Structure formats: C-alpha cells, structure tokens
C-alpha cells in the first residue's frame, strides 16, 4: 500500500502540474472561449477533427486533464485518509485537496457559462495552487520527508512561526496580483522593468495600477523572504529542513523575479510566462510545508521535554 501511495502521489503531482500549466496556457493564449459557453463539452459536443482550432484544442485538453487529475486527487485523498489516519494533518489536507479541486472546477464552469470577470478568474488560479499545495504536502508525508530531515525534533520560536504564517498568506496575495495582471491584460502595461524608462511614471489606467501593484507586492515578497532566511540561518542553522527549505525558496524567488522581468522584455513569451506561473506555485507549496512544520513546533517541544 505504501509503495502504491508513493507512486500515486507522484503521478497526482504531475497531473496537477499539467493542470496548472494548462490553466496558464488557456489564459496566455486567450483560449478560454475556445469551446463556447458550454461545459464540459465543446459547443455541446466532443471536438471533431474537422473543426479543430488551437484555442478549442487547448481549452478542451485543459478540461480533460482537469477531469483526469480529479480522479487522481480523489483516490489519493481517500487512500491517504485510510493509510495515514493516525497523522493529524492527513484528514484536513485530504479534505482541502478535494474541496478546492471541486471549487476550482465549478469556478471554471461558471466562467465558461456566465462569462469571465478578471477579479474572479484571478482567484481561480489561487484556488488551484491551494489544491496543488495540499497534494504536495500529502506526498511529502507519504515519503516521510520529516524523518529524512529529522524534522520531528524541530522547535520554532514564536517570531519565526508568525513570520512563516504571515509570509505564506502574503505570498498568496502576491500570487493573486500576478494572476490579476494576466486576466486584466496588464502584462505589458509598463513595458520596461522595473519601471518605465527607468523612472516611476504615475499610472493612468487600471492596467497600470495592476502592474505597478504587482511589482510592489513582488518586491516586498523578496525582501520578506530574505529576512526570514536571515532569521533561519541566524537562529536555526542546526535544522537541515529549515536551511534547505529557505535556500530552495530563495532559488524559487530568484527564478520568479528573472522570469517576471523576461516576460516583460520578451513581450510575454509563452514559455517564460508558463515557467513564471509554475515557479510561484512551487514556492507557495514549499511555504505551506514550512507552515505545516511550524504548526507542529509546540507539540515537538512538549514531546522533547
């Protein structure tokens, strides 16, 4: 059973990664209306080879991969619930994974049938990364990463725990601003990075405000992440799980900044934009894992005593 769970959890992560990629691809290529206003079929029927368009194919494939991923997520949640029922985090994570998967699908359906609001569609991406993060956490528990990094003895102080919780919430909000940039079609509102012609220009449109707000949010995120990393290396260097996680998070945020800048310089190159979406998804999942470790800190302290 354990071997099956390991294989299945990896396959589920791969499937959810494809879904995240697919959703970003739909947005980047403007394929959201590729299947008309019917759901789950395209214009009320399966795609016929005689009338295939790139937009229709992208949208239909996204729906199909979402359906397949749903099966993987539900099976993983049920099996983890049964096999790891003695772990206190298993049931909440399994419920979150399935619940947010359903919400994500319903929001996608609503957007197709009743039209797309950019602020709601930006939240659609945020829902998907919560589902993704819960699947990653279940997989890490299945692979017993805690034991490999000796995380069972990890004890965090209040300052670090509060910063990790707050940073994770803030990262989610920053992700929302990035998704809003895409859905408000503001990616090239300020075509030079970080500012227009090297100078700050007062925004004159909604797209300008959205773009500037996202860049400000990203800058604060980088500074905050550097601060938390400094805290870890100053006070918790003996815990490999923390030092490794923070180094990895810095790699992610550096790649995120680079792909963000390159997205502007290349006129929103499709592959760079997709990488930009995937990297922040993985960073959010990593921060959620740190939240999981922080939530265990008090019980670890009592157990060690």
UniProtKB/Swiss-Prot annotation:
Its EC number is 1.17.99.9. The lineage of its organism: Bacteria, Bacillati, Bacillota, Bacilli, Bacillales. Catalyzes the conversion of heme O to heme A by two successive hydroxylations of the methyl group at C8. The first hydroxylation forms heme I, the second hydroxylation results in an unstable dihydroxymethyl group, which spontaneously dehydrates, resulting in the formyl group of heme A. It comes from Listeria monocytogenes serovar 1/2a (strain ATCC BAA-679 / EGD-e). It holds the Pfam family COX15-CtaA. Keywords: Cell membrane, Disulfide bond, Heme biosynthesis, Iron, Membrane, Metal-binding, Oxidoreductase, Transmembrane, Transmembrane helix. The gene is ctaA. The active site is at residue 59. The chain crosses the membrane at residues 7-27, 64-84, 93-113, 123-143, 161-181, 213-233, 241-261, 272-292. It catalyses: Fe(II)-heme o + 2 A + H2O = Fe(II)-heme a + 2 AH2. Its main location: membrane. One of its GO terms (molecular function) is oxidoreductase activity, acting on NAD(P)H, heme protein as acceptor. The keyword Metal-binding applies. It is a multi-pass membrane protein. This is Heme A synthase. Belongs to the COX15/CtaA family. Type 1 subfamily. Pathway: Porphyrin-containing compound metabolism; heme A biosynthesis; heme A from heme O: step 1/1. Heme o binds at residues 62, 124.
């Amino acid at each position: 059973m354990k071997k099956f769970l390991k294989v299945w959890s990896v396959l589920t992560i791969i499937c959810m990664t494809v879904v995240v990629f697919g959703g970003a691809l739909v947005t980047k290529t403007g394929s959201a209306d590729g299947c008309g206003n019917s759901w789950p079929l395209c214009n009320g029927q399966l795609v016929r080879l005689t009338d295939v368009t790139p937009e229709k194919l992208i949208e239909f494939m996204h729906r199909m991969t979402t359906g397949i991923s749903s099966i993987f997520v539900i099976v993983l949640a049920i099996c983890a619930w049964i096999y790891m029922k003695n772990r206190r985090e298993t049931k909440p994570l399994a419920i979150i994974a399935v619940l947010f998967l359903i919400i994500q699908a319903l929001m996608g359906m609503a957007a197709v049938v009743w039209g797309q609001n950019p602020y709601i569609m930006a939240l659609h991406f945020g829902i998907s990364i919560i589902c993704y993060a819960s699947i990653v956490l279940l997989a890490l528990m299945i692979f017993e990463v805690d034991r490999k990094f000796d995380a069972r003895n990890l004890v965090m102080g209040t300052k670090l725990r509060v910063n990790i919780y707050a940073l994770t919430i803030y990262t989610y909000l920053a992700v929302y601003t990035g998704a809003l940039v895409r859905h408000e079609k503001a990616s090239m509102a300020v075509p030079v990075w970080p500012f227009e012609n090297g100078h700050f220009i007062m925004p004159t449109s909604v797209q300008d405000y959205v773009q500037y707000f996202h860049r400000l949010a990203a800058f604060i995120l980088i500074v905050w992440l550097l601060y938390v990393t400094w805290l870890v290396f100053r006070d918790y260097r003996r815990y490999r799980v923390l030092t490794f996680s923070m180094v990895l998070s810095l790699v992610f945020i550096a790649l995120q900044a680079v792909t963000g800048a390159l997205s502007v310089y290349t006129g929103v190159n499709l592959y760079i934009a997709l990488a930009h979406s995937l990297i922040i998804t993985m960073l959010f999942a990593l921060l959620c894992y740190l939240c999981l470790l922080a939530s265990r800190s008090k019980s670890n302290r009592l157990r060690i005593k």
